[in-house]
Structures are given as structure tokens and as C-alpha cells.
From Swiss-Prot:
Entry function: Microtubule inner protein (MIP) part of the dynein-decorated doublet microtubules (DMTs) in cilia axoneme, which is required for motile cilia beating. Microtubule-associated protein which regulates cell division and neuronal migration during cortical development. Necessary for radial and tangential cell migration during brain development, possibly acting as a regulator of cell morphology and process formation during migration. May enhance calcium influx through CACNA1E and stimulate programmed cell death. Overexpression of EFHC1 in hippocampal primary culture neurons induced apoptosis.
Assigned GO CC terms: axonemal A tubule inner sheath; axonemal microtubule; axoneme; centrosome; cilium; mitotic spindle; neuronal cell body; sperm flagellum
One family name in Pfam for this protein: DM10_dom
InterPro entries named among the record's database cross-references: DM10_dom, EF-hand-dom_pair, EF_hand_dom, EFHC1/EFHC2/EFHB
PANTHER family membership: EF-HAND DOMAIN C-TERMINAL CONTAINING PROTEIN (PTHR12086), EF-HAND DOMAIN-CONTAINING PROTEIN 1 (PTHR12086:SF9)
Record gene name: Efhc1
Chief place where the protein resides: cytoplasm
Keywords: Cell projection, Cilium, Cytoplasm, Cytoskeleton, Flagellum, Repeat
The protein, known as: EF-hand domain-containing protein 1
Tissue spec. comment: Expressed in adult brain including hippocampus, cerebellum, cerebral cortex, thalamus, hypothalamus, amygdala and upper brainstem. Expressed in soma and dentrites of pyramidal neurons of the hippocampal CA1 region, pyramidal neurons of the cerebral cortex and Purkinje cells of cerebellum. Highly expressed in testis, trachea, and oviduct, moderately in lung, and slightly in brain. Highly expressed in sperm flagella and tracheal cilia (at protein level).
Residues of the EF-hand domain: 582-617
Amino acid sequence: MGTNPVHGLPFLPGSSFTDSTKTAFHRSQTLNYRNGYAVVRRPTMGIGGDRLHYNQLSQAELDELANKAPILTYGPLKQAPLAEFVPAHVAFDKKVLKFSAYFQEDVPISMEEHYRIRHVNIYYYLEDDSMSVIEPVVENSGIPQGKLIKRQRFTKNDMGDHYHWKDLNRGINLTVYGKTFRIVDCDRFTQDFLESQGIELNPSEKIPLDPYTQLRKEPVRKYVTPSDFDQLKQFLTFDKQVLRFYAIWDDTDSLFGECRHYIIHYYLMDDTVEIREVHERNNGRDPFPLLMNRQRMPKVLVENAKNFPKCVLEISDQEVLEWYTAKDFIVGKPLTILGRTFFIYDCDPFTRQFYKDKFGMPDLPPVDVTKKEPPPVKQELPPYNGYGLIEDSAQNCFALIPKAPRKDVVKMLMNDNKVLRYLAALESPIPEDKDRRFVFSYFLATDMISIFEPPVRNSGIIGGKFLGRTKVVKSFSPVDNPIYYSPSDFFIGAVIEVFGHRFVILDTDEYVLKYMESNASQYSPEALASIQNRIQKPELPAPELESKQATGEPMVQGTEESKVQDLDALIDQIHMHLKYNSYKENLRETFQMYDKDESGYVDRETFFKICETLNVPVDDSLIKELIRLCTHGEGRINYYNFVRAFSN
């Protein structure tokens, strides 16, 4: 509530009074809506409800009202009703401005193009001022195309402003996300809309051509000299003349492949080729006659056409350097047509006569292409695992249910209960094994060997069966073709290797001698002499031999029997002389290596070479005498007797 001074009284305390009728002291409202539009009116009432005089009509307005204006006579003009308010998202719904543009893309690594021109369409959506960039899809372009920039509001500058349709026009550059688009044209609706808004459009431009696309559209220049060949003459001369060839297509190298027969027709009138398949009865194939229709066959293609599959390539004259002709079809030579290789093995009589007259080929012999039976497959046995006999193990590879190997029944009946027994010593560097003796039993019926060691009291070695009855393979025999020990390998001084153990035959019984005499053809003369002399020899006293060597008296070569006796006595003397000396154990194997014929002899040069390699004291007097006794004939030395002197 306020106080107002009374007119004519000074504004002093006591001269102002409060108007109790005034109850509203708010400011008058001047903002309002009329027909959907915001309007402003002048305030007419002040605070407290007092009328404002300074917001009334001006003097000019009062003068105008005072005039006799038509409005005083006819009244105020009626204003047209305002249009109904329509929001922008409704007014511009589905209204899009379309601009045609392009941008230039650099191609850094290419010898054929340095840049390419890509066409795009820029769409401006009036309802929310958003934009999008879409590139029309070009078939087989090899470039990811379609929507380049999704619909959004494009940033105009760093201040955060966005592009508006007032900023778009023809002939301007539009930079979005670092990529510059050149707007060259727009559609009819866009042109009408911009002109209706008072925007003057620039003239339209043309999109520049892409250099690589234009290069590909240009035809390949091919400078061909017109041929003087008369095709009409060829047609009239060779009409109804066809060369017939018989060929095969061998596809047996591939999975489920087979060899199929074909007939190749070459038409001389136009140099075309036709391939027909020869069907057999009940071959399981559809009896379609043609494999390849009649057409010209390319022989040499241009470089670019070689990388394309031949089976789907539509051949044209620009892609072919050379075509197949009649001289390319020769009997006995392969021919590749559309990636498939045919072998021509025969032709008809007319074709032979044509090649004889045209190319001077008098003889075109047919080639035999009948399928030959493959050679039988040799069954290969797996490697021997060392268990049991090889013959027994091999039966597992011959049948699902193994059978016992066949036996020589005649041999078993003739040699039943015939056993050859030998006394042998074990060659071993262990001193306790030097005095061990073994009895070898060779069973002639089955060629098996058993070894028995007689027990010796207080020897510390359990005697008895050393090896059960079995076949023994020689150490140097191959695994796939084993060689077993036979009776001819057993004689005095022979070394028998049984599963890594080396035995030296020392003695035998009278039955072995009788068997060797009755089967002398199986043994060498040295083997027969060694066993016979071993049984019948008298001992030569060693002191007498020593006296002969000491005095240097020559030993006269007597009979063969006395020579063997002297040799045995000399070997015993060398054993005592070389008792504390040791030599290599492979002395016998070295001699056998150089004895290719297994005769038991080597020449003198080889003999002394081996002795020098193994450090054998050949300069010793006893060794010299041993070499003399072991010499037979001219320059041949029996190394079996020589090695006996060095065995323990």
C-alpha cells in the first residue's frame, strides 16, 4: 500500500494520504499469444491500477484520427486471418535437397593411375538440417561403395557451427572430415527451393572424367595387315572334307579318373574343331554325343587372356594370337584343347592321304593305347624285429590266420637223428671266460644249432643249456635275406658268432669226420685237412722247435702230414711267446673283408699290409716261420691257420 500526495499540498509528512481502494500493485502483462504468434502490447495500467498517460496515442495519431479518414466512415479494415502454425519438422517432412558432387582420391602405389574421380550424392534433410554422403555403387569397381558418411549434422568450422542449406550452392567446395567434395549440380526440386528462398544459384559444372576409366574404355589398337587369304576359295575347295582323329583323354592320375576315348573332327572348310565322345555299352554315362561344339580353337592367347579361365572365356579375335590349324593335329602327339590334353593315337585313311599330299607325311603309324596289365606288386615284408625265426614272423604277413612255414620233409627224413658235434671255446677279454668250453650240436634235419656248456666243479659258472635249438644267422648277412650257418662253416679254427658271442671251434668227433669225407664237395680242402690232421696229429715237442729256430737250421718241407704237425706245434709255441701281448680282436674279420671269394687265402701284399695296419710283429722269428708254413703256392697265404696263433 502506497501514499499519494494531495494536489496543491507540499510533499511533506502529514500532507500525503493512503488510497485504500487500491489493492493491486503488480506490473501489467505486456506479452501474449494471438493466433499462435507471440505479440507485444503497450502497458496501459501502471502499478496500483493507475492509468498510464504516456502510453496513449501520440499527437500524430491524434491528428490522424481527427482527419476525416475513410476509416471513420467505413470502419477499420478487417485483417485476414493468420495462417495456422505448422512446426518445421512437419512442414519440411520428407523434403530433401540433392546435390551431385565428386571428390578426387589419390592412388599412391600404381603404375596405371595416380588418382581417381569418385562420384557422390549429397543429401540435405530440411526437417532437421542433417546431411549424408552416398556414393552410387558401380558394378565390379573393386572399391567399397555405398554410404560414405551417415546422416548427421556436418560441422562447418572450429567454432561449432553446422552447415545450413543457405551455405550450399553449385560450383563450391564442401569440406567434411578432411575430404573435399566439389558440388557440380542439383536436382529440379533443390533448384526451385533455393530460388524461392532468394538464393542465386551458380551455373552447373561437369564432372571431370576418370583417366583410368577412360583408358579402359578406349579400344585396344591392333595393327593388322589385311590378309590376302581367300576364305571363299577355301570354302569351295574343302567343302564337306573333314579330318577324323581318334584320341584319348587320360585322367587316371587324378582321384577316380579314367581313360576315355574321343573322336576329333577338323573341318577344312572353315578350320573349326568338333570333339565327340565314344560311348560304350553300359558305361553309366549319359549318351550325349558332343563334348565340344564345332568352333575355332585358340592356340596362343594374348598375355592378359592367359590369366582368365579358359573354360568360361568368350574368345574373340583380339584375344587370340594364333588358332589351331590342320598341321597341329599329328598322330602320336598330345594336343591341349581348352585346358584338356588329348593324345591322338590314330586317324582314318582320308586323313592319312591328306597329310601325305599336303604336308609330305607318308607314314602316320597308329599308336597302341590299349591298357596294359600293371606288373604284379612285390610284397615287401616289414623289418625283422629280432624275435623268433624270420620265416615264422613272415607268416603273419601272408594270411590273416598264420600257418607254419613249409618244411623240407625229404631232408628231414634223410637226415633224421644226424647231429654234428663240435667243441668250442669262447673268445672274450674276460679271463674267467677263456677256460670255458662249449659243445655245438648241429642238427642236419632242420639246420638248427644248440649250444651246451658242460658244468665244471668249483668254476663259479652255472653250466647247462647255453642256447636252445634254433637257426643262427651270420653276422654279415642282410636282414631281408638272412644267411644261416651251414655245416661247411664248422671246422677247426673257424669263428662262429652267435648273437654277439664269438666261439672258436677247437675239436670235433669222429662222426663229423666221416660226414665230411662222405660230403667232401661241401667243404673246402683246408677245412677237411684241418679236421683230419687235428684228430690224427702227434704232438711235436716245443723244445725241439725252439732249438731249430735258435740255431737257424732250415726246416725241410716234408709230407703234408708233417707240415701240419709242425704248424700246430709252432702255433702252441707262439701262444706261449705272445702270452702277455694283446692284439686287436678283428684280425680275422679284416682278412675276411679282403677275401672276396671266401677261399681262406689272401695275396702276400695284402697280407703284410693288414699286419702292418694291426701292428702284428711280422719281424719275429716265430712269426716268420708261421708265415712260411701258411704259404701255399705263389704269393698266397692261408690266414685261417695264421689267425689261430693269435686267438686266446
